[in-house]
Amino acid sequence: MNLLHIKVSPNLFGSASREVSDYLVDRLKVKHPQLNETVLDLSQEPLPHLDGFTIEAFFTEPEQRTEQQKNAVRLSDRMVDMLFASELIVLSSPMWNLGLPSVLKAWFDHITRAGRTFRFTDGGDKIGLVADRKVYVVMASGSAFSNGPYVSHDQFTPYINVAFQYVGIRDLNFIRIDGTHDPLTRDVAVPKAISSVDEMII
């Protein structure tokens, strides 16, 4: 079984999302001894944001692409291939300014491809082409967004839900770490998230 472990936080030491996702992956490896983990660290190897030339290449039939266009889509193709090759996905990320870090948004832009990860029907609807698989999303935020007055400010969770569903993935499991900006609340939030991992059916 193949696991794609996507890491987003640029904080390599002391990141709450990294700590909890690493714990989750360790738990998964205990349950699935043959688990093959592929780590995609977007903070260390950020994907370029899409430009006009690359988008044009996406919508050019593969057999009609120039060498330059083939080169332009190669990285995106690799991201899509990694997605298709995985049976499990663990995504760990902070919430920044109510939403996604731009490196994570870039990943979604690279893997959301007409004809590869979704298709249009004759009626104009869209159908995801990635077979449903289990996704664990470990999300850390400086303030509390899972309850209280700021719930509606959370733009991260709805985007992640819709973006994965867009390509056909609906089995999403969120593990939230609220209040990481304050050492006192962080010291409660991280163990709480780890306990929630222990309670999950994985």
Curated annotation (Swiss-Prot):
Homodimer. Quinone reductase that provides resistance to thiol-specific stress caused by electrophilic quinones. Its cofactor is FMN. Binds 1 FMN per subunit. It comes from the Bacteria. The gene is azoR2. Belongs to the azoreductase type 1 family. It is an enzyme of class 1 (oxidoreductase). FMN binds at residues 9, 15-17, 95-98. Its EC number is 1.6.5.-, 1.7.1.17. The keyword Oxidoreductase applies. Keywords: Flavoprotein, FMN, NAD, Oxidoreductase. InterPro entries: Flavodoxin_fold, Flavoprotein-like_sf, FMN-dep_NADH:Q_OxRdtase_AzoR1, NADH:quinone_OxRdtase_FMN_depd. It catalyses: 2 a quinone + NADH + H(+) = 2 a 1,4-benzosemiquinone + NAD(+); N,N-dimethyl-1,4-phenylenediamine + anthranilate + 2 NAD(+) = 2-(4-dimethylaminophenyl)diazenylbenzoate + 2 NADH + 2 H(+). This is FMN-dependent NADH:quinone oxidoreductase 2. One of its GO terms (molecular function) is electron transfer activity. Gene3D superfamilies: 3.40.50.360. Disulfide bonds: none annotated. The keyword Protease does not apply.
